[in-house]
Amino acid sequence: TSQDRVADIGAMVTEVLSAMKIVQGFNQEGREHGRFQEAVERTFSVARRRVMIRAAMTAVVILLVFGGITLLVWRGAQAVSEGTITGGTIAAFVLTAGLVAGAIGALTEVYGDLLRGAGAASRLSELLDEQPVITAPARPQELPVPPRGGLSFRNVTFRYPTRLEAPAITDFSLEVEPGETVAIVGPSGAGKSTIFQLAERFYDPQAGSIRLDGIPLTGADPAEVRRRIAYVPQEGVLFSANARDNLRYGNWGASEEDIWAAARAANASGFLQKLPQGLDTYLGESGTQLSGGQRQRIAIARALLRDAPILLLDEATSALDAESERLVQDALEHLMEDRTTLVIAHRLSTVRAADRIVVMEDGRIVEQGTHQQLSSNGGLYARLASLQFGLESA
């Protein structure tokens, strides 16, 4: 339908505009212009066909209506000449017929509106009919209070729904003690990010179990599980709102004092104070008015305000300069005291102080231990460390 084609154009425009620097950097403006033009032409063709059908229907209705009126006038004129009815009567009939004709003509407009509404309703009904895969059980198990922060993976095997032929992790077992800091390292595609998604129960594994403080995640309310976790992604995600709302997104009850304390700990207070309206400054769509490092620091402050017993850090300092990284790392180390922390590290220099380092490859744990132990084992970690530290020193 034309509604589908218009939706496709909207999605294409949003995608290209959000990646404009990539488009320009690879000199693909011409190609994207061509794609957009083709999409517009397809939409125009569908709309033109719809308009032509609608115009034909309108023409038929007008022909029938005015044909009927003409026949009525002709027969009325005959009746007037024969004296069976008066001229006033025929005039009243013609006026009434005109009103009826107008109403019938408007039906074509209503029919067109109904078709457009049916197209939109069809798309909405598909979304409304979708059932959530992850739901709370009828009688969820209560998580321990106060929370301890223990997290365990036992023989977990997981395949993404779109890639059932290739397991993301296989027979994965990991016991994380309360207050322990565990760094997860490995090459791209090893399954590191999958661990985080399973921990927050965005997916359920096909085999094995995941427990939070001894309670299986499948038996707990997903909302309660996520309240005990603070997550900092590799790239800071902000919303089209002011700085204050972005900071307290994970804790709407945070006071002004708490907000500024978290901002100072994340080394974000300096640039926040310089914003035109301070915390009330609108940050633009997805925080486009800030640099990547500034967005990341707001994301870290947001996690600090969450004050959850478990922290998931996906290389939380990767977007910061050297000085800011040191300050934020100090703040994170203070924050991680007495909290369970899982860190996905792409730079091995950020995980040397972890209590334990887990090395993953092809969805499995191949090594684990401290930095000193793994560096002397001559395994995958030692190879990654020698390569990375050698490049950094060079």
Per-range role (PLM):
Residues 1-11, 15, 21-70, 113-116, ...:
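An intracellular "coupling" helix at the cytosolic face of ABC transporter transmembrane type-1 domains
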Residues 11, 18, 22-25, 45, ...:
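Regular, well-ordered alpha-helical segments
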Residues 15, 22, 42, 73, ...:
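The DHp (HisKA) dimerization/phosphotransfer helix of two-component histidine kinases
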Residues 36, 124, 153-155:
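Conserved catalytic Walker-motif region of ABC-type ATPase nucleotide-binding domains
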Residues 49, 53-122, 127:
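Helix-loop-helix
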Residues 138-143:
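Short, solvent-exposed loop/turn elements at beta->coil junctions and helix N-caps
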Residues 144-394:
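ABC-type nucleotide-binding domain
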